[in-house]
A protein has these predicted regions:
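Post-transcriptional modification and biogenesis factors for structured RNAs
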Residues: 1-129
Length: 129
């Protein structure tokens, strides 16, 4: 499953009452790290052998066709602007979440949930669960 969440310092206040309610208290059960320079931190993850996948409208492959069984980081942008060009450029792969009809993008929570479900499913199969 997920072992932690990394956010930019420019993100919303994680301990704002609305945020805490939205997480249903999970914010207290999941380690998180706020980073000042996300691109530098992403480079450190890559140096440590962690594969990085960015949810991106320019992704040419489906998120479903990727292997998430090894050390993995999923990059999700904000709802207004998506990922910065700098972060998207540092990801190992840009992937898409296929959508039907006129839907162009999903909010960050939904995109994150879709990825986490896929990662969990792949790892459960690998472990024979």
């Amino acid at each position: 499953g997920v072992t932690g969440v990394i956010v930019s310092r420019k993100t919303a206040d994680l301990f704002q009452p609305k945020t805490i309610r939205a997480t249903m208290g999970s914010i207290y059960r999941m380690p998180f790290l706020e980073v000042e320079r996300p691109a530098e931190f992403l480079s450190r993850l890559t140096e440590r052998g962690i594969r990085t996948f960015a949810a991106h409208l320019k992704g040419t492959e489906s998120y479903r066709t990727q292997d998430y069984t090894g050390p993995t980081a999923i990059l999700i942008g904000n709802e207004g602007n998506g990922l910065s060009g700098e972060l998207a450029g540092k990801a190992d792969k840009l992937v898409r979440i296929p959508m039907e009809g006129r839907v162009e993008s999903l909010n960050a929570a939904i995109a994150s949930a879709i990825f986490m479900y896929e990662v969990h499913g792949q790892r459960a199969i690998e472990q024979g669960v």
